[in-house]
Amino acid sequence: MTYFVFFLSLCFVLGGLAVASNPSPYYGVVGLVLASVAGCGWLLSLGVSFVSLVLFMVYLGGMLVVFVYSVALAADPFPEAWGDWRVVGYGVGFVGVLVVGLVVGGFIECLNFGVVTVDSVGMFSVRLDFSGVAMFYSCGVGMFLVAGWGLLLTLFVVLELVRGLSRGAIRAV
C-alpha cells in the first residue's frame, strides 16, 4: 500500500508538472486529468471515498470546461508538445525548484520547525473526518454557492478579456 501511495504522489507531481510546464492546452488537459486522478486515488487510499468522488467530479467538470474554452481560443496549427526545448526547460526549472524546496524543507524539519498535528507520528497517521458528508450538505452549501458564482464570474471575465475585437468566443450577433 505504501508503494501505491508513493506511485500516486509521483503521478500527482508529474501531472502538476505537465500542466505547469506550459505546453499547449491540448497536452495540458492530459496533465490535469493525471493529477486529479492521482489526487483522488490518494484520498481514496486514505478511506475518504465520498470526498474523493465529489472532488473528482467537480474538479474535472469545472476545469475541463475551462480547458475546452482555452482550446477553442488557442487554435494553433503547430501546438507545443512536451518534447519542445522551451517546455523541457520549464520542466527542468520546476523540478529544480521542487528539489530546492525539498532540501530546505528537510533542513527546517531537522530543526523542529513546522506544523505539528495531533496525530503526527507517521505517514499514514491522519485523523479522518467522518462527518465530512454531513458538513457538505449542512454548512458547506453557502460556500459552494459562493464558489460556483465566483467560478462563473471568472469564466465570463476571462472570456471577455481574451475576446479581442469581437473575434473570441463571445461574438456580437
Curated annotation (Swiss-Prot):
A GO cellular component annotation in the UniProt record: mitochondrial membrane
This enzyme's EC code(s): 7.1.1.2
Membrane topology field: Multi-pass membrane protein
Entry GO MF terms: NADH dehydrogenase (ubiquinone) activity
Subcellular location: Mitochondrion membrane
Transmembrane annotation, as ranges: 1-21, 27-47, 48-68, 88-108, 139-159
Catalytic activity: a ubiquinone + NADH + 5 H(+)(in) = a ubiquinol + NAD(+) + 4 H(+)(out)
Coiled-coil spans in chain: none
Keyword Transmembrane helix part of the UniProt annotation: yes
Top-level EC class: translocase
Keyword annotations of the record: Electron transport, Membrane, Mitochondrion, NAD, Respiratory chain, Translocase, Transmembrane, Transmembrane helix, Transport, Ubiquinone
Family (UniProt): Belongs to the complex I subunit 6 family.
Free-text function comment from the UniProt entry: Core subunit of the mitochondrial membrane respiratory chain NADH dehydrogenase (Complex I) that is believed to belong to the minimal assembly required for catalysis. Complex I functions in the transfer of electrons from NADH to the respiratory chain. The immediate electron acceptor for the enzyme is believed to be ubiquinone.
Protein name: NADH-ubiquinone oxidoreductase chain 6
Organism, scientific name: Fratercula corniculata
Protein's gene: MT-ND6
